Regions:
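Charged (often Lys/Glu-rich) extended helix/loop segments that serve as interaction or gating elements
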Residues: 260, 265-422
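Structured core elements
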Residues: 72, 95, 115-117, 139-141, ...
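Flexible loop/turn segments at secondary-structure boundaries
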Residues: 58-61, 125, 147-148, 193-197, ...
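A charged N-terminal "starter" segment
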Residues: 1-136, 175-179, 183, 217, ...
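Conserved, mostly hydrophobic/aromatic
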Residues: 31, 55, 77, 109, ...
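Active-site loop/helix belt of alpha/beta enzymes
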Residues: 144-291, 354
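Glycine-rich, aromatic-flanked loop segments that form ligand/cofactor-binding clefts
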Residues: 132-147
């Protein structure tokens, strides 16, 4: 199985006439088709809503595309709340899931009418002291501890995670929140990251559904929603079988009917926060080969670096690479594909089998639509690249310009004795 880019060499050659490489490119048609598929997969649940994890791809043009499908925003910081507000999201279309949260962020989330998802038991008093009340609708994050497993083995270790409340804390939190005026409750949990299996959401849903039945019976709280959070992953490697959201939705539906409906809780809404699944496959980093080096290994130097995509350098993550125009050429050369940072980990690929790469070739680094641009940084004085939307009509639209040296030095503009010029 091979990955096929959503953009052709001919299209890139036209785009670079206006916008030089490197740049992050997004596929509007793919984003829209996937958003509709998610809605269709959970259409059986009238209250369903996907809250896109803004941290994954914080671009207003992309958020507004998702808004067309009545999706919300999952925010975890003041600036993400600002971005959501500026795109027209408000009230219960914003989920504020934060941890170690400053008071001003709780206050701003409350001002916007966002649903606040409390990460810790001690945040109850902190929130009340900060905003002067407990919201009528409130959510709490649950951490079951231990190890979360599926049929294909260990998936993750919640017991080693800093997030969420224990079961005992969760039950006590609901009782206290109810006594302080909360009327509608939600439960949130995130137990594994980037799962490439259709089992994850159904298994998580089963655990949370059984939990909220117990919560309602013991506390009398009105459970309004169960938030399955994120964790539904994408197939970064060509030999992986992608998740099927329709199968996942049907699996959640099955356990919903088995657990919640018999308990008289058939009106509970399902929420999700799928940043990676919503965007990763529909973005790529386009870069150009500018150097080759032949020492103990064969190196191809490109004009992008880890500052544009940090996942391979920091996490050792695999991102597939296509050499545009050579999709059908034999992969008979072994390269390290590297950037220009003064760090030896600045490598997009190590010992990767690729077609012969010539200087000036354009490379597509796949699946960067989530946690790609958003995790960029300025180490080594490198500047963040542009973001471009490949619109459904085939036109390329600039949706964020590339940084300039003036942007890099902008935070010195308050000092009269510091002037940095070429």
């Amino acid at each position: 199985m091979k990955k096929t880019p959503f953009v052709t060499k001919q299209q890139v050659e036209e785009i670079v006439k206006k916008f030089p490489t490197p740049f992050h490119l997004y596929d509007e048609a793919g984003i829209r088709a996937n958003a509709q598929a998610v809605k269709d997969a959970f259409a059986w649940n009238p209250g369903f809503r996907e809250y896109f994890a803004v941290k994954a791809t914080p671009n207003p043009y992309l958020l507004k595309i998702l808004k067309d499908y009545d999706m919300g925003c999952d925010c975890s910081s003041y600036t993400e709340l600002m971005l959501a507000k500026s795109c027209g999201f408000d009230g219960e279309h914003i989920m504020f899931s934060s941890n170690d949260t400053p008071a001003e962020e709780f206050a701003y989330a409350d001002k916007l009418g966002a649903i606040i998802n409390l990460d810790d038991f001690t945040h109850i008093d902190f929130l009340e002291e900060t905003i002067g009340h407990i919201p009528e609708t409130i959510s709490c994050r649950y951490n079951p501890g231990g190890v979360f497993t599926l049929s294909n083995g260990i998936m993750d270790n919640p017991g080693d995670s800093k997030y969420g409340m224990t079961k005992e804390q969760l039950f006590e939190a609901f009782k206290i929140l109810k006594s302080k005026g909360a009327k509608y409750f939600g439960v949130h949990a995130f137990l594994a990251s980037n799962t490439v299996t259709n089992e994850y959401y159904p298994q998580l849903a089963k655990e949370l559904f059984e939990l909220v039945v117990e919560l309602k019976n013991e506390t009398g709280c009105d459970i309004k929603f169960v938030n399955l959070s994120g964790g539904v992953g994408v197939a970064y490697k060509p030999d992986q079988i992608p998740n099927d959201i329709s199968v996942i939705g049907a699996g959640v539906h099955k356990v919903y009917d088995e657990v919640l409906v018999p308990a008289g809780m058939g009106d509970v809404a399902i929420y999700t926060e799928m940043g990676r699944f919503m965007m990763a496959p529909y973005g790529c980093l386009v870069t150009k080969a500018i150097h080759e080096k032949h020492i103990y290994k064969e190196y191809i130097g490109v004009d992008a670096c880890a500052a544009n995509l940090m996942r391979p350098a920091v996490y050792g993550s695999y991102h597939h690479i296509t050499v545009l125009g050579k999709e059908d050429a034999p992969c008979d050369h072994t390269y390290d594909v590297v950037g220009s940072l003064c760090e030896n980990c600045d490598k997009f690929a190590i010992d990767r089998q690729l077609p012969k790469i010539d200087m000036g070739d354009y490379l597509v680094i796949h699946d960067t639509g989530a946690h790609g641009f958003s995790m960029g940084y300025n180490y080594n004085g490198r500047l963040r690249s542009a973001e471009i939307l490949l619109e459904s009509n085939g036109e390329a639209k600039l949706i964020r310009r590339a940084e300039t040296p003036a942007d890099y030095f902008a935070t010195f503009d308050c000092f009269d004795d510091i002037k940095i010029t070429e």
